Regions:
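Short, structured coil segments at secondary-structure junctions
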Residues: 12, 57, 80, 116-117
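Short acidic/histidine-rich active-site segments
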Residues: 119-131
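A domain-level signal for caspase-like cysteine endopeptidase catalytic cores
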Residues: 1-56, 86, 100, 104-108, ...
Length: 174
């Protein structure tokens, strides 16, 4: 998915930096170093995850062994992207309790980007089928770079996935 998105954007003249299969330090450095117009995050999302080596639970995107990209990491970004696409399972999920206990992150990545002022955020509200998620991302970006408005590009991509991937509910996750 990430390679396909990077290719689509590069073919339209966007300056693309990818961190595909990079380690945690490279990912975090790139996230904070550049002023991103479009930020596409693809990976596995976790909610209130804790491994044997972690002292507290974390919610966010897995970016390495026992390393989770959290809303706190996002909050430290110097610049606010215009568009953020988070294609991970569970990352659109909200904690209805609004927990503020030490070490517990009540917010998720999508919510943090919205709080920061990102103009448009796409995030999956539940676990998505990998193939359908990739197809959604490709359909969305194809339309965006062709000049369609954000809402119409999302609607049309959802429709495409509803038709193409009729046995999964991924179309409704975005």
């Amino acid at each position: 998915e990430a390679r396909s998105v990077a290719g689509t954007l590069a073919n339209e003249g966007y300056d693309v930096t990818d961190c595909i299969e990079e380690g945690t330090p490279v990912i975090l450095e790139a996230l904070h170093r550049e002023k991103w117009r479009i930020l596409h995050l693809a990976g596995h999302g976790v909610h209130e995850y804790q491994s044997a080596r972690m002292s507290v639970t974390r919610s966010g995107m897995v970016i390495g062994l026992d390393t989770i990209l959290t809303p706190g990491d996002i909050e430290q970004m110097r610049w606010v992207p215009e568009l953020v696409f988070i294609n991970c399972c569970h990352l659109g999920r909200m904690d209805g309790q609004g927990k503020t206990e030490p070490g517990v992150l009540a917010a998720n990545l999508a919510e943090q980007f919205i709080k920061m002022g990102v103009k448009a955020v796409i995030a999956a509200g539940w676990a998505v089928d990998d193939a359908a998620g990739k197809a959604f991302a490709e359909a969305f970006y194809r339309r965006m770079v062709a000049g369609e408005f954000f809402g119409e590009a999302v609607r049309a991509a959802r429709h495409d996935i509803f038709v193409l991937c009729e046995n999964v509910n991924t179309w409704g996750a975005y």
